[in-house]
A protein has these predicted regions:
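Short pre-catalytic segments that frame enzyme active sites
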Residues: 90-158, 165, 169-171, 188-191
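Short glycine/serine- and small hydrophobic-enriched flexible loop segments
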Residues: 107-108, 164-171, 222-225, 251-258, ...
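Residue-level preference for non-acidic, small/hydrophobic
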Residues: 102, 109, 120, 128, ...
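Extracytoplasmic/periplasmic proteins that interact with beta-lactams or build/remodel peptidoglycan
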Residues: 66, 70-119, 310-313, 319-320, ...
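Residue-level detector of conserved, function-critical positions
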Residues: 1-89
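A penicillin-recognizing enzyme superfamily signal
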Residues: 210, 232-356
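Conserved catalytic neighborhood of penicillin-recognizing serine enzymes
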Residues: 147, 172-229
Length: 357
């Protein structure tokens, strides 16, 4: 920062927020309510007029603040922060009919489960073109269009596929046995892994295939630990700080599932495909969620942090030669019950409609 500016304007912080303070005039130039501020540049259009510019980020927006150094009046220019918010205009392949139908289904799903915000995305599985990406939120009881948040949900949805990939890399068969015990695994004094049925005594001894198809967290943990760096995989798969969105979920799932576009070994592809397809067949925990008249590969997930619940679906179809990849994410305030069944009917409406298109 220029010495003159540095002597006069300082960036102050309070409770994790930032603002600009004028030491010369003992004046708070801005409120201390921004997420990030940094000095940008100094501009002197004429001898008697000087401006100091700062870059800032606040919520979903970013911009520049220009301060008139004579009287501290401000000029601001702001826009959606491209790191946090996507734009439909960036995707010339958007299909207006698919987008409209996707919005309808997302709106109905949010109404059915009291969603506060949600996203839906449809990808062309053969070209990876984005055909639809939309977002809605509930504002005072009305469902309205919302910004396309790039950080909406956890990567935890992918856990069964990460586990299947780890088994292939470690040359461990899906038919090998894994002991999930009584549904609770104590790693240390502060970390416990619980299966969803731990109150009923857990799954006990399973094959890895059964463990992954039943989404046993203990089984998936042991699958990842078959690799020397398995704990890193576990932290990545369960890390709440590594967030994604409906468009990325659909795109990445299509990438790892589509044989022609993945530069990994046949064993790794085979494991991922097997788990993704068998999730919706007899023996898979989601077999009752399968759509009619189309073979689906994918997964549902419900994440609950005690405050909010995130319902997520990602998948592609038809499984033998995918035409579309779809993802839907809906968030709501924590309450019980919470099950994938609460969104699967609406997801299947979209899948079955697309399959006939």
């Amino acid at each position: 920062m220029d010495s003159l500016i540095q002597a006069r304007y300082v960036i102050v912080s309070m409770n994790g927020k930032y603002g600009i303070y004028d030491r010369e005039k003992n004046d708070s130039v801005t409120a201390v309510d921004m997420d990030y501020i940094e000095y940008s540049h100094y501009f002197q259009p004429e001898e008697s007029m000087c401006f100091c510019y700062f870059y800032y980020e606040k919520g979903l927006q970013c911009g520049k603040i220009g301060i008139n150094m004579n009287d501290n009046t401000k000029m601001e220019a702001f826009a959606d922060n491209p790191r946090l918010v996507g734009k439909v205009e960036e995707f010339p392949t958007i299909d207006s009919l698919i987008l409209a139908r996707s919005y309808d289904v997302l709106s109905e799903c949010m109404a059915a489960i009291d969603g506060i915000q949600g996203q839906v995305a449809v990808i062309d599985a053969s070209t990876s073109d984005v055909l639809a990406w939309g977002a809605l939120e509930n504002v005072e009881g009305a469902t309205v269009a919302a910004p396309l948040l790039k950080r909406l949900c956890s990567l935890e949805t992918y856990m069964p596929f990460v586990a299947a990939d780890c088994l292939a890399q470690s040359k461990t068969s899906l038919e090998d046995s894994v002991d999930t015990g009584q549904g609770v695994l104590v790693l240390n004094d502060s970390v416990r892994i619980r299966d969803h049925n731990w109150r009923r005594g857990g799954y006990g001894m399973l094959t890895y295939r059964q463990a992954l198809l039943n989404k046993s967290r203990i089984g998936m943990y042991h699958a990842m630990k078959t690799l020397p760096d398995g704990m890193d995989y576990w932290k990545y798969a369960t890390g709440q700080t590594k967030n994604t969105n409906a468009m990325e979920l659909a795109t990445v799932f299509n990438y790892i599932f589509h044989l022609d576009s993945v530069n990994v070994s046949a064993d790794r592809r085979s494991n991922i495909r097997a788990i993704a397809i068998e999730m919706f067949k007899e023996g898979g925990i989601q077999h009752k969620r399968a759509p009619k008249n189309v073979e689906l590969a994918g997964v549902y997930n419900v994440a609950d942090d005690g405050t909010e619940q995130t319902f997520t679906f990602v998948g592609c179809f038809p499984a033998d030669k995918p035409k579309y990849a779809v993802s839907m994410v809906v968030q709501r305030k924590h309450k019980l019950p919470a099950s994938p069944a609460m969104m699967s009917d609406k997801v299947n409406e979209l899948i079955e409609w697309l399959n006939k298109k």
